[in-house]
């Protein structure tokens, strides 16, 4: 499969590419995070139709969550452009979302079948993006991730370590809980999913 990775210069993007190169089962093409800050739909159309692709792997928003740039309305509009063009061209879509779609107020562990219930601005934006993709695309696979970390920056763990090295004071919340995952493990799982898609498995799911 020929895969367009949005956010190829992110820690996750580097991990995806490092897994793909030795396996040589799929061709990875992609754009850096700065390039994905499109201002017009025609910029997205030019990217998608420049070369024939089978799958869009969208790592934009899950990367921004762990960075310093806010996720907001412009990202929803860009996702709309991507989804409509992918639907028109018959391109499958693999979207990396976040567990932040859940509020964390349940007293039991969340299940993927639970209805997203986040009320904070970030969580509500992520929910809106997921709903937009499901409403627009027939072949969309959504994978929700927890906090990611790795050796490459930017990521929350690296920022915390850098701050400690400078002697800065770090503020954290007692109420935020999760299961951090290394970007290499995410990349391994992603390649497994893509392999199954390439072998004929359904290209939609949550």
Positions of predicted regions on the chain:
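NAD(P)H-binding glycine-rich loop region in Rossmannoid oxidoreductase-like domains
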Residues: 35-80, 85-87
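Conserved Rossmann-fold NAD(P)-dependent oxidoreductase catalytic core, especially the SDR/UDP-sugar
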Residues: 80-119
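SDR active-site strand-loop-helix element
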Residues: 6, 31, 59, 93-99, ...
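Short-chain dehydrogenase/reductase
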Residues: 6, 72, 76, 108-130, ...
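A short beta-strand-loop structural module common to alpha/beta enzyme folds
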Residues: 26-38
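NAD(P)-dependent short-chain dehydrogenase/reductase
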Residues: 131-178, 185, 191-192
